[in-house]
Amino acid sequence: MGSGDTRGESSLVAKPIEIILNKLPHAILAQQQFQKYITSPIYRYLSKLLLFREVAWPESTKDTQKGQVGIFSFQNNYADSATTFRILAHLDEQRYPLPNGAAEKNLPSLFEGFKATVSIIQQRLLLDNVDGATNSDKEKYVQLPDINTGFVNKTYSRIDLTHLLEDVETNVENLSINKTLEMDELTRLDSMINELESRKLKILERVKHIDSKSTNLENDVTLIKDRINFIEEYSLEADREQSLRKQMEEERSSEASSFTQNEEAISSLYDVESKDTRLKDFYKMPHEKSHDKNRQMHIISETYSRNSTAFRMTIPHGEHGNSITALDFDTPWGTLCSSSYQDRIVKVWDLNHGIQVGELPGHLATVNCMQIDKKNYNMLITGSKDATLKLWDLNLSRELYLDHSPLKEKTEEIVTPCIHNFELHKDEITALSFDSEALVSGSRDKKIFHWDLTTGKCIQQLDLIFTPTHSDIKMPARSLNNGTCLLGTEAPMIGALQCYNSALATGTKDGLVRLWDLRVGKPVRLLEGHTDGITSLKFDSEKLVTGSMDNSVRIWDLRTSSILDVIAYDLPVSSLDFDGKLITVGANEGGVNVFNMERDEHWMTPEPPHSLDGDELSRRIAIVKYKDGFLINGHNDGDINVWTL
């Protein structure tokens, strides 16, 4: 064969290769459907062909190198051309594995997919040469043949009809294959959407975690600011060397001089004028409380859905040792104060870590009731069997609890977290409640005192009048703790009370609920229904909920004074709380009974695992408090459990 024949053969080879390089890769690579069913090595090779045409084959030398493109395509520095061709032509299943269940889907083969896609490529090549063709036109994957039904009805040529039938069947088959490809694409998109949803949930969890960390840092900022304000309030700022020097000098001082100074301080502590001054100064100090709590509550409410009880922590048995007699806390996860039977010291806890951060010594007997200010001041008011009420500065109690507190270096006076004593009752305090600037206390002496918190003075005295039938009722002991106040065989004379502005509700041992108007100092309504002493009550603008030793909880309509519902239990109700939607009840059982008034649903908190070791009597609930989705209950064995509802 001569050289002329060789050039002729090269010319015949170059023309199809030019078509492949100029037209076919563009059309094939533009099809997502083709990309999926052609293996990735071949797809990459087609891409390299385009790059080779544009870079390695400049316009000035195209004509002279077209005949050599077949050789250039398989030349490399790692293998000969034959080996390179076998590698490129090999379909590696590991590189493009079939999805699970692909065999069951009966997907078209690679060749069938190629045949169905060729028509699409041809149409797009034609549309590329048509002026004014839009992208929407190019998206029409398959154009159906124009079948002349009149010709079909009139022709008698079997050959023509056979060819037409083959053409139509081919198009039907191609449409079926394309439909299968599109449905598989839809399945893949659904899988991607599910994967994105899963990733979205993971991102949301990370956002919650970040938000929680941010909230903790913001709480730390608030804590630092409060600490700075505290140092400024009590003039505690001093350099480190001066503080150490002062401590060494005090250690050298004699016990006699220290005793003399302490004695003078004690006498000044009980001076009435100095106490009144300290109470006024207390309200002038900026007792900042963190109000940016909605974010943390939002996160917790997302993590723990409504009506699902989640156990958070336990302050272990042994911290109190005896039955919890009173507790209250500041939401969310702020300060918890608690007291136990025969323990005269109120303990202050940090609910973030479940550790004790302060103590309030001063009462001479068991503390029966307490309340933390929920608005502006970080203060606590307690009522005791020693017939006194005390107002405490919780910030100061935390400071004094520290071993290195500079306040302990002040020997010229005794510093105590007790800001004021309320001393008018003649018998033990069994219930108290305060709101805004008013404090109301009830005692076993059958008297209710209305106090002005700003001055510490008694505004008025309310006398309870009992009928002879109820004047000397003796109740048998039904549990270690009657609930909010007393331990013993006698029901509390005033078991519970709550005030709001000028409204006051009291529950007494005769089973009656009295509604008072503090502006006139007289009861304006009487609610009858309980058959035994009332141990707890709580009201809002529409409803009043009461718990009694008659084993029942009653829900009252304050507008009509009628009973809306009665919930019966097997044992006396020791304590309850109410926020307008949920009622939490301690009925001398191992768990807290929860009642959702809106949904009419009842459930009970489970017993924590550690509590299963004790006897039934020690595991009973003595007192419950519920605020903003947080439930805290105290047991007869001294344990305090924290829950989210």
Curated annotation (Swiss-Prot):
Function, as annotated: Involved in mitochondrial fission. Has a partially redundant function to MDV1 in acting as an adapter protein, binding to FIS1 on the mitochondrial outer membrane and recruiting the dynamin-like GTPase DNM1 to form mitochondrial fission complexes. Plays a key role in determining the polarized localization of those DNM1 clusters that are not immediately involved in the mitochondrial fission process.
Protein name per Swiss-Prot or TrEMBL: CCR4-associated factor 4
Coiled coil: 160-253
Composition-biased stretches (Basic and acidic residues): 242-254
Region (Required for interaction with FIS1 and MDV1): 1-274
WD repeat positions: 319-359, 362-402, 424-463, 481-528, 529-568, 570-605, 616-645
Cellular component terms per the entry's GO annotation: mitochondrial outer membrane
Organism: Saccharomyces cerevisiae (strain YJM789) (Baker's yeast)
GO biological process: mitochondrial fission
InterPro entries: Caf4, G-protein_beta_WD-40_rep, WD40/YVTN_repeat-like_dom_sf, WD40_repeat_CS, WD40_repeat_dom_sf, WD40_rpt
Subunit structure: Interacts with DNM1, FIS1 and MDV1, components of the mitochondrial fission machinery. Interacts via its WD repeats with DNM1. Interacts with CCR4 and NOT1, components of the CCR4-NOT complex. It is however not a component of the 1.0 MDa CCR4-NOT core complex, but appears to be part of a less characterized, 1.9 MDa CCR4-NOT complex. Interacts with DBF2, another likely component of the 1.9 MDa complex. Interacts with SRB9 and SRB10, components of the SRB8-11 complex.
Pfam (any one): Caf4
Membrane topology per record: Peripheral membrane protein
Subcellular location: Mitochondrion outer membrane
